[in-house]
Amino acid sequence: MCIRDSSFLVQDQQGQRFEAILKSFDRNSLLFTPQKPVAIPPASSLRIEILQALPKQKALDFILQKTTELGVSRLDVFCGMHSPKTFRASEKQHHLKRWQRIVSEASKQCGRQFAPEIHFHPDISAALETLPECPNSWVLVPEEADAVSWKKISSSGDDIIKHHRVLIGPEGGFHQDEIKLSLRSGMHPVYLGPRILRSETAAMSAVSILQFLWGDL
């Protein structure tokens, strides 16, 4: 419930935030008076990019919202070979607008000045060809063999890594051809433990771990 003369925060299209006083409201509008500007929390010094195979809509909404809150810089969505559904090229703009609205709302809720970038690709091959080079690129794999450990890398004493890209599969996991293609493109396999994670859990866990080891958590 809105209470007249109560204060709240507003954010404009340039990302500036202000304290405001509510004067009146009805079903379709609010009238408020801007007061003093409010400091914006600094952006994360760690650039994290998520390359996400398309999961179910509810799971993707969760991924977009929570990774935005955790400070992800860019989200690239593609139709995976095991994705539960795909959509036609003509539907691309409709979905992008919806996704952009979700990350915009999440950014305002958590105090971010700007929302992350969002892009869509028809398949993993197109995504890998389009993305700029990132030496610290990872693909989440279900088995520990040949996989690297972020914890071991972070404790090795090497320079602080400030740019990561993580490839995450849908609910059905990756097709073997997708894993092979990602490894040929220069990605490194990484293992998040013995438990089977949902796609949305894997995305949120990966971003949280990276922020804890190299970012601002």
Regions found by a protein language model. Give the residues of each.
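Conserved small/polar residues in nucleotide/adenosyl-binding loops
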Residues: 1-6
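Arg/Lys-rich RNA-binding interfaces used to dock onto structured RNA substrates
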Residues: 9-65
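Short, ordered loop/turn segments at secondary-structure junctions
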Residues: 13, 37, 79-82, 194
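Generic structural signal for residues in well-ordered beta-strands
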Residues: 32, 115-119, 189
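RNA substrate-binding interface of SAM-dependent RNA methyltransferases
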Residues: 41-138
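Short, hinge-like loop/turn segments at secondary-structure boundaries
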Residues: 93-96, 156, 208-209
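Active-site/ligand-binding-proximal alpha/beta "capping" segment
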Residues: 134-173, 177-179, 187-190
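Structured adenosyl-cofactor binding patch, chiefly the S-adenosyl-L-methionine
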Residues: 176-217
